[in-house]
């Protein structure tokens, strides 16, 4: 039984509503909600994922920015389970406060136009997040999961993999959506690492090193990082200054950012 409803997609909000039952079921199976868990869906839209999750779990919190979807979501959810709706921009939601001591499981078909900001916002609250299952443009998922040497390995890859285990799960074709996007989508799982194993001394310094390294990716690290790293930084971190950012492992960036010169 599908309780999702029809509503026009708003291009300004980057909305593409999932409509294919096969892929809806695959996402719900990947999430595999269990009793006692705190599920939070970002951008429920027409409820394609919302209502199957609610039916399976009994309770769900959703964050929806589009006010026109609030009433139909509330009405359709009433006979199914306890749906809590937060009508706000997801980037303004404090996930740590929302978790309230119980790590949240984030789920969502993320709007293409703000997917990266949402990912970095979730990272800021990683200690309060158990895991994340997101659908995004396939090219973004490819970048998230890429390794050194790949043409799509970059800032997003390093920043996410430093704090999370990233696993690309499956591709979702344009025809599964209404309206269909122009590109393939993919579902990705992110599991935040134990904070005790994330050996980053200064998060801002780490982010600065990664950003600068990939900001001019054709340059050697010596040149790309000249404003923030001295030759001694490379020596102490055992990182070759004549290498390029795309050749470094995540651990190399962490060591380089952690170096403190006397």
Swiss-Prot record:
It catalyses: adenosine(1518)/adenosine(1519) in 16S rRNA + 4 S-adenosyl-L-methionine = N(6)-dimethyladenosine(1518)/N(6)-dimethyladenosine(1519) in 16S rRNA + 4 S-adenosyl-L-homocysteine + 4 H(+). Its EC number is 2.1.1.182. GO terms for molecular function: 16S rRNA (adenine(1518)-N(6)/adenine(1519)-N(6))-dimethyltransferase activity; RNA binding. It is an enzyme of class 2 (transferase). Pfam families: RrnaAD (PF00398). S-adenosyl-L-methionine binds at residues 16, 18, 43, 64, 89, 109. InterPro entries: KsgA/Erm, rRNA_Ade_diMease-like_C, rRNA_Ade_Mease_Trfase_CS, rRNA_Ade_methylase_Trfase_N, rRNA_adenine_dimethylase, SAM-dependent_MTases_sf. Belongs to the class I-like SAM-binding methyltransferase superfamily. rRNA adenine N(6)-methyltransferase family. RsmA subfamily. This is Ribosomal RNA small subunit methyltransferase A. It comes from Xanthomonas axonopodis pv. citri (strain 306). The lineage of its organism: Bacteria, Pseudomonadati, Pseudomonadota, Gammaproteobacteria, Lysobacterales.
